[in-house]
Curated annotation (Swiss-Prot):
Keyword Electron transport found: yes
Protein species of origin: Escherichia coli O157:H7
Record domain Flavodoxin-like: where: 4-143
PROSITE patterns: FLAVODOXIN_LIKE
Gene transcribed to yield this protein: mioC
Protein name as catalogued: Protein MioC
InterPro entries recorded: Flavodoxin/NO_synth (IPR008254), Flavoprotein-like_sf (IPR029039)
Keywords: Electron transport, Flavoprotein, FMN, Transport
Disulfide topology: none
Quaternary structure and interacting proteins, as annotated: Homodimer.
Length: 147
């Protein structure tokens, strides 16, 4: 089993790029990783460390590829008390639902007993053409919280 499972939800691929970049950085730091783009809940171990990275679609909506995961969290209320997670949202401050998807995912993970490690990073694409840059900066401090 990987030390850290990266879970991405993306409409245009931005969150996938961030997940893949952070997986490389985590491996350079000595962690083993598994990156899953739009996994189903049953694809995941109910323990360990998850890093959830999601863009926001439409009016604060979960990306289509992560909707089944989110809906399963809501409906099944799994016991995720053995999961620690970090969260990164990607969105545009042009919308009043800025990073609404990661807010929803974070809430459902906590409702299922998962413990958040660190603060959620919310990346405004208007300020960062390359969302991998602020995500990598955040990752350094997040790694320290895992120790």
């Amino acid at each position: 089993m990987a030390d850290i499972t990266l879970i991405s939800g993306s409409t245009l691929g931005g969150a996938e790029y961030v997940a893949e970049h952070l997986a490389e950085k985590l491996e350079e730091a000595g962690f083993t990783t598994e990156t899953l783009h739009g996994p189903l809940l049953e694809d995941l171990s109910a323990s360990g460390i998850w890093l959830v990275i999601s863009s926001t679609h439409g009016a604060g909506d979960i990306p289509d590829n992560l909707s089944p995961f989110y809906e399963a969290l809501q409906e099944q209320k799994p016991d995720l008390s053995a999961v620690r997670f970090g969260a990164i949202g990607i969105g545009s401050r042009e919308y009043d639902t800025f990073c609404g998807a990661i807010d929803k995912l974070e809430a459902e993970l906590k409702n299922s007993g998962a413990k958040q490690t660190g603060e959620t990073l919310k990346i405004n694409i208007l300020d960062h053409d390359i969302p991998e840059d602020p995500a990598e900066e955040w990752l350094g401090s997040w790694i320290n919280l895992l120790k």
